[in-house]
Amino acid sequence: MNIHEYQAKALLKGYGAPVAEGVAILKAEEAEAAAKSLPGPLYVVKSQIHAGGRGKGKFKELSPEAKGGVRLAKSIEDVVANAKEMLGNTLVTAQTGEAGKQVNRLYIEDGADIDRELYCSLLVDRSVGKVAFVVSTEGGMDIEAVAHDTPEKIQTIAIDPETGVTAADVAKISAALKLEGAAAEDAKSLFPLLYRAFNEKDMSLLEINPLIVMKNGHLRVLDAKMSFDGNALFRHDDVRALRDETEEDAKEIEASKWDLAYVALDGNIGCMVNGAGLAMATMDIIKLYGKEPANFCDVGGGAGKEKVAAAFKIITADPKVEGILVNIFGGIMKCDVIAEGVIAAVKEVGLKVPLVVRLEGTNVELGKKILNESGLAITAADDLDDAAKKIVAAING
């Protein structure tokens, strides 16, 4: 689960992190009062969407010359004008795709005198089985580009879970970021509290880009991104309350209600599979034959007919889907249950695209019999390779 920047900063502020004063608004009419409540005279007006690259993004409804989704304002009047121009419009960034995201809220923040921009994130480094700091002196820009072009400028410091962030760890991080004086002193409290927040809130990612050194020498969190482990949200009512479903794919929200592992993708072949490994293999073979999967959908090992039907309806709700491949290996999951669920869903929503079903495992013959006797236009496949060829051929006509 992701949250907005202003929410992430409020959470970090609660742990004692240095963040600027700011106010979130939902209406342009609130911009003037928000700006007046801040020290000024510089302000930053930030679009709040769950996507990076906001500053370089462009609004669909505005001219190409218009400013992006993060704007500097030098007066309260500028804040108001920018708020009127940004709220309600669609921001397209490198991470949103061509569709973009509608800006439904803004964060009006006090400006900062920036001396240096740094990068700092925490994530789970699975290669060593520890939470690690990933830091770079090249902050305020696309960290993926830095990793590709100048990987030597990125350093990783793994933290021993038994000790937490030690003075030696802080020294390593500070050296990597070339922190001195007041910034180095701030680091002694900042990095341990970031680690504590990451662990206590069950985050999967905490990214600060940029972490700045101000002209007075002190550190400040200028931007913050947080992702949380969805499987741990039951422990965090406060975090769950921050969820903004308008920023999420409607199909993924519906899938979560059925405990389906569903991720929307950009292709045109819908996939319904049981087991994450088989789902990955199914997507791979679709790509091998020249097409792209429209989704990752794992119905799990113990799904009933209703859950299968729900998964099928979610897949068919995607207008990009031009064909559907159902690939089931029945172990705990029974093939006849899959067949009944697919048929129930097809009868309810209709079938306007080709459907190929490959079944193998428990009750496979019964499952095939149910499909064959359904009278529906369902193409049977003998194995995964055969299934992929048939769905691609059906789409190509």
UniProtKB/Swiss-Prot annotation:
It comes from the Bacteria. Its cofactor is Mg(2+). ATP binds at K46, G53, R54, G55, E109, A112, E117. Pfam families: ATP-grasp_2, Ligase_CoA. Pathway: Carbohydrate metabolism; tricarboxylic acid cycle; succinate from succinyl-CoA (ligase route): step 1/1. Succinyl-CoA synthetase functions in the citric acid cycle (TCA), coupling the hydrolysis of succinyl-CoA to the synthesis of either ATP or GTP and thus represents the only step of substrate-level phosphorylation in the TCA. The beta subunit provides nucleotide specificity of the enzyme and binds the substrate succinate, while the binding sites for coenzyme A and phosphate are found in the alpha subunit. This is Succinate--CoA ligase [ADP-forming] subunit beta. It comes from Rhizobium etli (strain ATCC 51251 / DSM 11541 / JCM 21823 / NBRC 15573 / CFN 42).
